[in-house]
UniProtKB/Swiss-Prot annotation:
Gene Ontology molecular function terms on file: RNA binding
Region called Disordered, residue ranges: 122-149
Protein name (record): SsrA-binding protein
Record gene name: smpB
Entry-linked CDD domains: SmpB (cd09294)
GO cellular component: cytosol
Coiled-coil parts of chain: none
Pfam hit, one: SmpB
Cellular compartments annotated: Cytoplasm
Annotated keywords: Cytoplasm, RNA-binding
One GO process term, biological-process aspect: trans-translation
Function recorded in the entry: Required for rescue of stalled ribosomes mediated by trans-translation. Binds to transfer-messenger RNA (tmRNA), required for stable association of tmRNA with ribosomes. tmRNA and SmpB together mimic tRNA shape, replacing the anticodon stem-loop with SmpB. tmRNA is encoded by the ssrA gene; the 2 termini fold to resemble tRNA(Ala) and it encodes a 'tag peptide', a short internal open reading frame. During trans-translation Ala-aminoacylated tmRNA acts like a tRNA, entering the A-site of stalled ribosomes, displacing the stalled mRNA.
Family classification: Belongs to the SmpB family.
TM helices/strands, residue ranges: none
Length: 149
């Protein structure tokens, strides 16, 4: 079940491969995510010292958050993957000019997971081409429905 999606990533990037990663979260963050108070729109992933980190993911604390905890909505969060996956991603990002983007936050066996995509940036004309293709598919479906009615 999806919690939050980053639809803008599919508009701005060609997604080559997808990986599923765990996230290191605090208790108040888990509660806020379960309440749907998370946003991936401005988020991105960086590599530091051989580890992956999610930056810019906004998790709004619940008003009932504890007073002894100082919640930071946009703090850097560590991502958890197997070592061989991290090495593979680092190699592709450093050599081939790829970038890592968060695509979807979802539940898997009661745990919160983040789907990340190995992506290559789209140029402006690629974005326009994708938009035209989507529009044509919509028009084609509309014409087929009208013909069969």
């Amino acid at each position: 079940m999806s919690i939050a999606q980053n639809k803008k990533a599919f508009h701005d990037y060609f997604i080559e491969e997808k990986y599923e990663a765990g996230i290191v979260l605090e208790g108040w963050e888990v509660k806020a995510i379960r309440a749907g108070r998370v946003q991936l729109k401005e988020a991105y992933i960086v590599i530091r010292r051989g580890e992956l980190f999610l930056i810019g993911c906004h998790i709004s604390p619940l008003p009932t958050a504890s007073t002894h905890v100082n919640p930071d909505p946009v703090k850097t969060r560590k991502l958890l993957l197997h070592a061989f996956q991290i090495k593979e991603l680092i190699g592709k990002v450093e050599r081939a000019g790829y970038t890592l983007v968060p695509l979807d936050m979802h539940y898997k066996a009661g745990k919160i997971k983040l789907e990340i995509g190995l992506a290559k940036g789209k140029k402006q004309y690629d974005k326009r081409e994708s938009e035209k293709r989507k529009e044509w598919e919509r028009d084609k479906q509309r014409l087929l429905r009208m013909r069969h009615s």
